[in-house]
Amino acid sequence: MKNTTFIFLAIFSTFLFVACGDDNNTTTETQEVVQLKGHEELDLNQWGFPMAIMVPDAENHGEPQVVLTNRGALEIVVGQSFGIEIMYGEGDIELLKMDLEEDLVFVSEILSQEENLLIYKQDIPESGVKTQHHFFYKATINNDVYEIRDLQSEQFGEKMIQDMIKAVKTLRYVPAASTATDA
């Protein structure tokens, strides 16, 4: 009887340790570098953003142009078909949807919505203005919330927006490298 109780306690303890173990495995899995064909990784730490993202490769599209704006947004432009901005925020998709509905200039249509992503298009009826496609993505990286969207000042086609979304979904946490002055 004592042996049975001991074996039962040993098995129960093993399950308890496994179930209550450290969650580092999920963190490691989310830190894997996702490769996209024709893209290369861009580390954003030098602009104060502890993350990296896959952007179209420089060989075929030109060097990434990265600018930290006065309002705190990090704008990344590569060639003519890639332009995004990343900034701290709440990532409130519902608020954006309300803004789109109440817009007095544009007629907006939501094309697709996921938990952290909104894809929409805007048009000014009978104006001759080309339909604009946009996206808004909410990313939580190292417990900070970031809002990522296409550059509103540019015009991108639907396929360009889809390609940017694929790149944005590769965002991952990359801690800043320690320097001698940190010690």
Residue spans for each PLM region:
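N-terminal secretory signal peptides that target proteins for export/translocation
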Residues: 1-2
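Conserved polar/disulfide-associated segments of primarily extracytoplasmic proteins
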Residues: 65-159
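N-terminal targeting sequences that direct proteins away from the cytosol to non-cytosolic compartments
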Residues: 5-8, 15-72, 151-183
